[in-house]
Design a protein with these regions (language model features):
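Active-site neighborhood of glycoside hydrolase catalytic domains
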Residues: 83-104, 111-212
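Carbohydrate-binding surface patches
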Residues: 285, 296-332, 343
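N-terminal catalytic cores of secreted or lumenal carbohydrate-active enzymes
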Residues: 1-103, 123, 133
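Conserved, mostly hydrophobic/aromatic
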Residues: 54, 105, 178, 230, ...
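Glycan-recognition and catalytic regions of carbohydrate-active enzymes
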Residues: 265-311
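Short acidic/His/Gly/Ser-rich catalytic and metal-binding motifs that mark active-site loops
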Residues: 7-11, 62-69, 111-116, 158-161, ...
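Aromatic/acidic polysaccharide-binding cleft in carbohydrate-active enzymes
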Residues: 201-279, 295-296
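C-terminal beta-strand-rich structural cap/linker in extracellular carbohydrate-active enzymes
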Residues: 339-351
Length: 351
């Protein structure tokens, strides 16, 4: 997150100031504010896997830039559009100075969510104006034009929002695509937007697993709707939210989501692997960067298939039924029969 998310210990930005002391020159910008562990952890992760690509999004602009002077709700003030674009530039530059390259950003996490802690409302017209007149030009002027911008970053119930942003030609020239969550709506919304603008990418960027759920049911739901569903509807990325939490689903802000289970639960030296871990494990090891989705019939069991750069074929299949199901794989004149246990998912690989 660019600044605090609702899963930070407290709400903050990198340019917090009293309301009566605005900082339009960002003299007090401080990338070390807030989560002290974040930058060292990202550096350690990138040392292990330098090829990892990172995406960043803010939950809120600094309060002094907002109409309500608070980190929850409110909108970006019209006279703060330029300095907020500069805020993104300063963040990207500060992270690069620490060896952390951010490959993509969204202007606002969940821009129609006014209740989260932190949060900020940004309607489609506002986002288009911010991108075309401020954020996009600021990135290019700073030599950061290769950083990809994705609009929206919210639910599948409002495809009209990203479509409105993309319909503005001046905004679209800076866009790489749209980002999506699935706390409302249907995953097929991704296809609607992709069909309207096939030259733009679709990324699925967030879905959390609740602590009040049940492992088996949650795994099947996320596999069907998020991993298989997003890929079948054109997404090139699937991100689960979030990486890790403690047994009490902490940290989170006082008004943030208190039920979000990380992919890993960390309890001292003990690590528990949860739904998001196994969901990603079914695909990440096999579907390597550069893989492409290939056709597969979906009438019997939900599935998605890929062709890897090495020529391997990957098929991820879900059986939500209460009994085992047998299915056939037909490829280049050859057939294999596979039995998948009840309420199970499998990843099949062949060359």
């Amino acid at each position: 997150s660019l600044g605090a998310s609702d899963l930070s210990e407290r709400s903050f930005t990198y340019a917090d100031r009293p309301a009566d002391q605005p900082d339009f020159e960002l003299v007090h910008f401080d990338i070390e504010a807030g989560d002290q562990e974040l930058i060292p952890l990202l550096q350690e992760i990138l040392a292990i896997n330098p090829a990892l690509k990172l995406m960043a999004t803010p939950w809120s602009a600094p309060a002094w830039m907002k109409t309500n002077q608070a980190l929850v709700g409110g909108r970006l003030k019209a006279d703060c559009y330029p300095v907020y674009a500069d805020y993104f530039v300063r963040y990207l530059q500060a992270m690069r100075a620490r060896g952390i390259v951010i490959h993509a950003i969204t202007p606002q996490n969940e821009p129609q969510n006014f209740k989260n802690d932190p949060s900020m409302v940004m309607e489609a017209g506002e986002q288009a104006r911010f991108i075309k007149a401020h954020l996009g030009p600021a990135l290019r002027q700073a030599g950061l034009g290769e950083v990809e911008i994705f609009c929206w970053d919210h639910n599948c119930d409002a495809p009209e929002y990203p479509l409105a942003v993309m319909a503005d030609p001046a905004a679209r020239r800076y866009l790489s695509g749209s980002a999506w969550h699935l706390y409302a709506g249907d995953i097929t919304a991704l296809s609607k937007v992709r069909q309207a603008y096939p030259e733009l990418k679709v990324y699925f960027t967030e879905q959390w697993v609740g602590s009040d759920g049940e492992f088996g049911g949650d795994l099947l739901w996320h596999m069907r709707n998020v991993l298989i569903g997003a890929c079948q509807n054109g997404s090139q990325v699937v991100l689960e939210w979030n990486l890790a939490s403690d047994p009490d689903c902490c940290p989170h802000t006082p008004g943030g989501e208190a039920r979000c289970v990380g992919a890993l639960t960390l309890d001292g030296e003990h690590v528990t692997r949860n739904v998001a871990y196994y969901l990603i494990a079914h695909v990440a090891k096999w579907v390597r960067p550069g893989s492409v989705r290939i056709h597969s019939s979906t009438e019997a069991l939900p599935n998605v298939a890929f062709l890897t750069p090495a020529g391997d074929k990957i098929l991820i299949v879900l059986n939500e039924h209460a009994e085992a199901k047998r299915f056939n794989i037909r490829h280049q004149g050859k057939t294999a029969s596979v039995s998948l246990p009840a309420a199970a998912v499998a990843t099949l690989v062949w060359t």
